[in-house]
Amino acid sequence: MRQDDLKLLGKIVTTHGIRGQLKVASFSGEFDTILSLETVVLKGKDGRMETFPVARATVHHDRVLLSLTPFTNINEVLHLISAVSYAHRDQFPPLEEGEYYWCDLIGLQVVTAAGTVIGRLDSILPTESHDVYVVRGADREYLIPAVEDVVVQVDLEAGTMTVSPPEGLLDL
C-alpha cells in the first residue's frame, strides 16, 4: 500500500450501538470528506494498517458514524477503538477554486509578498469566523488569519503560501 498519498482524517473514539458502527472524531472538524469515502485505512495501536470498504457513513452530532464491511456487530469492532483513520487523497471530493484541504496546506512554506520567509505552516486552528494558520518560524510561532486580505496566494505546486500581513501582525 502506498502511504505517500494517505491523508490523516481522524480517530475512532468509540462504538455506536450493537451493529458494529464506529464513531470517528474528524481532526479537521469537517465531515464531507469522510462521508464521501469508498474505503478507509485504519492504523491500529500495533501500527498495522488495514483498508476497509465503507458500507455507510452518517453524521451524528459532532462525529461521523462509520459502518465498515465486513463488520456487523459490536464485538467485531472493539479492537478498532483508538485506531487512526486515513484515506487516499484521490478519494477526496473536488473543491471549488480557492478552497484547499488542510492536509494540502500543512507543510507549505509561508512567505511575505516581499519574499521574506516566515516559516512552515504547522497546523490550523478552526474558529467561528475563519481559520487561523499556525506558522513555525526559526525562533517563534506566528498566528496568521486565513482571510483573503492576508493570504494573497497559495501555490501547492511550488509548496508556498504568500501572505500580506497587516503591520504589526508578525510582531505579536
From Swiss-Prot:
It comes from the Bacteria. GO terms for molecular function: ribosome binding. The keyword Cytoplasm applies. GO terms for cellular component: cytosol; ribosome. Pfam families: PRC_RimM, RimM. The keyword Methyltransferase does not apply. Belongs to the RimM family. Binds ribosomal protein uS19. The PRC barrel domain binds ribosomal protein uS19. An accessory protein needed during the final step in the assembly of 30S ribosomal subunit, possibly for assembly of the head region. Essential for efficient processing of 16S rRNA. May be needed both before and after RbfA during the maturation of 16S rRNA. It has affinity for free ribosomal 30S subunits but not for 70S ribosomes. This is Ribosome maturation factor RimM. It comes from Geobacter sulfurreducens (strain ATCC 51573 / DSM 12127 / PCA).
